[in-house]
Structures are given as structure tokens and as C-alpha cells.
Amino acid sequence: MINHLMSILISIFLSGYHGKTTDFAKNSSCHRTTIAHFLNSGKWDDTLLENTLKSSVVEIIYSEAQRTGNPVFCIVDDTIASKPKPSSQALHPIEDAYFHQSHLKGKQDYGHQAVAVMLSCNGIVLNYAFVLYNKSISKIDIVQSIAKELPEPPVMSYFLCDCWYVSEKIINTFVQKGFHTIGALKTNRLLYPSGMKKKLSELDAELSVTEKGFDPVTVKNRKYYVCRWTIGVFFRQCKTRLALDTYQIRSSKGIQRYWLLMSMAHYICVIGTGRYQSFQEGYQLIRSTIQQEKYQYLFQCAKSSIDFEAFMKLAG
């Protein structure tokens, strides 16, 4: 199990990585089908790894909040891992892939939709959950379930989201856990100030006239809400560096296991090099270290003229 995990994690930091089983096999003595079996149906406890990763993320973020007094931000959004539309004759299409409305592309996009939850404090941003949305449970229920499992933070904290996740159910669940919601609202949303039904656009117009300096989106001069943008950066990193758009795994279980290892790679980049740093800094450091060790081994092989088979494998 450890050898397969390491083969996958190391391959992430090598040139030409696309999340394919052939990429994983380049760093393993096993055939690519063996590694595919490990992801799709291998008997290993991915739930234990997931819970361990979640506990570590909570410990790091909550400890930072306790140390600095800064709020914890729980940030939620979703994205689509785009995949090619399958042929009508496909015998084994990718599981749990559907058409979803892409706001980024402005059209329907085929692939897997993921709901991501990030925890952040004082500039440290870590992925807490990356959940496959397969239409068997609503995204609102997914987020509510995650909110229920979070421990109460040591300081006043905030749940940041866009208008899709601003619902009574989610707001109430998060406030019970010590998180106040800061989120976007659709202008046609109905509110009941003083028991009177009003559209948000109407209330905004009234308060803009009656309340000096009223701004419906101002919270700490917008300093808190802009922290939500880090999840967009995370999605972009997953797609450009961690092969979220290009992995080739067919089974639903294999996909969720791959996403777990993708989150683990992000975690390693941020905290695994001996100090907290951005994902990009950690990624470049680990990648350059792997390359340096590879070239050092190549040099030693050439110098001593031993292990020629290993030398040729690395050189190729």
C-alpha cells in the first residue's frame, strides 16, 4: 500500500504529469493495471486516511487561531472536473459523470462535480474535504453534513460562500458550531425585516437612501469576504498541477480515492517542508528536490558504473 501511495504522490511532482495510471507506473515496479486496481478496488482503508488528514487540518488551523486570535474561515464552493463526453457505444463509461451547468464556461459541462471545503486562518489555507456530488444527495446537505462534523473553533469564525449555499439550513447549522455566515445573496431573494416581506433589491434601495454609508456587501471593509477567493485559487491549482481535469480513472471509488491523494499532495506542499508556505512555493520546492536527488543518483551511477539498469530507467 505504502509503495503505491508513494508512486502516485511522487509522480505528481514530475514533468508531464496528467493523472494517468501510466504516470503512476513510471515510479513503481508494478504494472499500471496493478496501481489502477489499488485505486479502484484495492483493500485499504481510505476512510482512515481521510479522517487522519481532516484531523490534522483542523489541528493546524484551530491552533493558529488560538495562537493569533484571528478567525477561522470555512470556505465552500464547487467546481467541475471536465471529462470527454462518452460515446453512445461506450461499454464502460466513467462513473458518476454528468452534465453540470458551468458558470465559468457559461454552458453545460460534462464531468464530475466536486464540493470543496477549505479551512483557513492567518494566511494558512488547507483543504478539509473534497466531496463527489453525484445527485444522490444535494450540495446543501453535503455542506450541512460537513458543518456538523467540524469542532467549534476557539475564536469567533466565519463561513464564507456564494449565493448558492446561503440557505437557512446551512446558516443555522454553522452558527451552532460557532461560524457566522458571510455570503452573497441573489437580488431576488425574499427577506422579512420587521416581519414585512421584501425583495433584497427593494431593501437595498430603501437602506441606501435612509442609512448613511450603507453597503450590503461590506463586512470588515470586505476584508473577510475576499478570503473566499482562495478556494478559486485552490481549484486552479488542482487543475493545472494536480490533474483534476485530466485524470483517467473510471470507477467512482477510484476517483474519490484519487481526490483524497490530491488533497494529501496539497497538504504536503503547504505544511510538509518544515514551514507553512503557499501551495505553489511548496510544490516548486518538492519538485526541485526530487529532480536534484534524481540527478545526484544518475551522477553516482555513472561515476561508479554500477546498477546500469536503474541508470537507464532514470535517464529515460
Predicted regions and their residues:
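Basic, amphipathic alpha-helical segments enriched in Lys/Arg and hydrophobic/aromatic residues
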Residues: L244-F299
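Charge-biased C-terminal accessory regions appended to nucleic-acid-, cytoskeletal NTPase
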Residues: Q292-G316
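Structural motif
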Residues: M1-H4, L104-Y110, Q248-W259
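Gly/serine-rich nucleotide phosphate-binding loop at the start of the catalytic core
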Residues: M1-L49, L53
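Active-site-proximal, Lys/Arg-enriched surface segment
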Residues: S11, S41-N122
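Short amphipathic alpha-helical "interface-anchor" segments enriched in bulky aromatics
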Residues: I80, R222-I249
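An internal, acidic/charged active-site-proximal segment
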Residues: F130-V226, E281-I286, M312-L314
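Short, conserved catalytic/metal-binding motifs centered on acidic residues
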Residues: F24-A25, N70-P84, V117, F159-V166, ...
